């Protein structure tokens, strides 16, 4: 039984209450009585409306299901569009407008660059991400497949000089392209110095300067013998580290020991899809790490290579400007926080009727209270120098739900004494009803919006669930080539530019999900800035370092200017449904699809349920590591549910596949000492039961979301573990 403290009609888990009282409130300028009174008022005012919005989702889905049962996949798109307008799914588009968001940090409003998303419950990951503002290009190239392991350039255990030479050559070529010298190459540089406020590069007696002297930002150390020189292109900095005593610098003609990229400009500290937070214990862990990030004192100590390492937040970088004045560059990524959406409740707080409080309301109040340690009256201003708090709000369906979030944020600001519109909003364009009404969604948050982002993973899950009754969907791997997805990606950019986001907000693109395949990422992910996105998601600090090179190659502001005049993507294309009109899959095709989906589901769910790990690199059926979170789970589970519903596969076939793939997942996790095998005790495995629920009850899940099943089963597993621990203790 959870120990609770009752205040103003709220029954708060003692763990959360004590955390707020002892750790969060001191230093914010907000007194405890005001905080709890305001939280109660917000909960009891807004919770009924939150529930009404969820009921509207269900009502619209029921009408769409009935329409598809009568019509199947629409051959008459005009009739389908008219139906969606009639039921209020597709809303009238209002006149053109421009967003008016103000007090936005340049990392969001002005500079294009990579964005990390990291589970805030993992302090080490969170610190690594925050510190990924800067990343070693040498390390990123040497340690990944970005440099081929051919012609003697294998990674191996020790340092390979041949591989090192290829890394240095790659980096010098990058410098030649990004920050060119006048009539010279960085490959031939012998010495760097600063003379008369300009960078001078010597070449054994000859000298060259930058083709564009304005690219020189500053240096540290002595002008005649700097420790580093800092250059810039498209607003992104590059630090050339000079150290002739360093193992690399000592062998380099110019003494260059490293090239350090400005990499993850922004990081989303995630309380949502990449975490498993089901109760007060979990929420306190998430909030405590967010608190440490906002106060600047988060630390994590761990063992690495037999030594104890303590990780903390990096300090700002102090430099001398070309004119001799002191300047600072931020040492950390600008942090946003992703709250949960409108769907879930959490037992951490109960309302006066004993109902669990909507988790999105709880997140808004607690993450904002914590942010006061950065932007409040006594705040450090070490995250947002502009004095704003950035909240990414996921999984909203249409402008009415965005307006509800805007009202929630306003209520939180009033409660905490924040100026109006201090809390900025990132809108995830990952639900179909938001996509088709995107302009009106942005209008609803026009004073707060700092971010729109296509999340094609969740968006595909919603696509499948919305049109579940239309027919069997095409194979999952074919989705990226479907008509709707290309239109969706372009539509997001088109609408964002139309609404004036350029120069004020981010227009983002989705995740590169293969953290080990960096050569492929370097080749392909440049498509995101070329498409007009001024940020895109990457799975690791290393990936951020490499993806940053794309923003040197592409001037996103110029791309956006060019795109403003193109013809807008077509609504009809977005509304086209990816059903297989005449499926002709062979039994082998079906088996492969089923195996792939089932293995992905089990590989992710078993860690979520048994270990509380919400985001991890899960080997796929071909043992390629993929970053999995609830979005990928939503697609896979909905896809099997769809094929089951339309008779492409049978329940027996699916169950046989799930059991067979459980053995594959067990073998893939054989090296994990904390792993609990699924097979052969399928009935006893809560994780296996959760995976089966997601598939066999997939049509019943609200909008195809996985959270209700995952939360219920994780709570069951935690209770089982506590019971087992108590039994062990009594025996001991």
UniProtKB/Swiss-Prot annotation:
This is Malate synthase G. InterPro entries: Malate_synth_C_sf, Malate_synth_sf, Malate_synthase_TIM, Malate_synthG, MS_C, MS_N, MS_N_TIM-barrel_dom, MSG_insertion. Mg(2+) binds at residues 430, 458. PANTHER family: MALATE SYNTHASE G. Its main location: cytoplasm. Its cofactor is Mg(2+). The active site is at residues 338, 629. The gene is glcB. The lineage of its organism: Bacteria, Pseudomonadati, Pseudomonadota, Alphaproteobacteria, Hyphomicrobiales. It is found in: Cytoplasm. Its EC number is 2.3.3.9.
